[in-house]
Amino acid sequence: MAVQEMGQTSPVYRTMGQQEFNDIAGRILYEDNHLLVFNKRSGEIVQADKTEDECLSTTLKAFVAQRDHKPGAVFMGVVHRLDRPVSGAVIFAKTSKALGRLNEAFLTGQMHKTYWAVVCNRPKEDEKLLIHYLTRNEKQNKTYTSLTPKQGAKEARLRYKFLTATERYFLLEVELFTGRHHQIRAQLSAIGCVIKGDLKYGAPRSNPDGSISLHSRHVRFSHPVRKEEMEIVAPPFCPVMKSCL
């Protein structure tokens, strides 16, 4: 939203209540002048979509403007996205230079991401590299897997590792080597390890809050300006994951 005054367009950000302000502040995992890493909850969207719900980039702009008493525009560039029902670490750039460099790192595989997934069945092998060929159905907003190359399909690679088990579920660590649509959800479902709460890929029931039990746990990348290696760990929200800490 913007207002016009004396020929100048100035951004106007909403004012947060104290409870929301404190919640946002408490979920910032790292911040400096160049970037901000945020712990996203399930249900939040990273970037604006057709729902017209407020996205995190807009929320964080409002937060920074309010916290820093910033009269001008706040830059909050989206480096990568997480699906709406997924939680965990999301990186935002606070300058256009940082955004360009972080986008390049993401696209060239220099950004390493590890996820935690709570699944309904234990995998046959405790650790394995999975390679599938994925085809996206836009109308269904769903991804289908194949073990062999198909026309229009994209290769997807991830490595999972079994970490521990609870009475009913199993916790996997997933290292992502490619960033395809619904990749982890589709590939784990393909080996019979559907993610808890993920009805779209075969879970028997939803989670009470509409989430799926998939969390962006760890990100590692080179700082876009200082060039030092950054490692960020995002605490989980999922009760099953919390019980495994």
Question: Locations of the language-model features?
Answer:
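RNA pseudouridine synthases
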Residues: 1-245
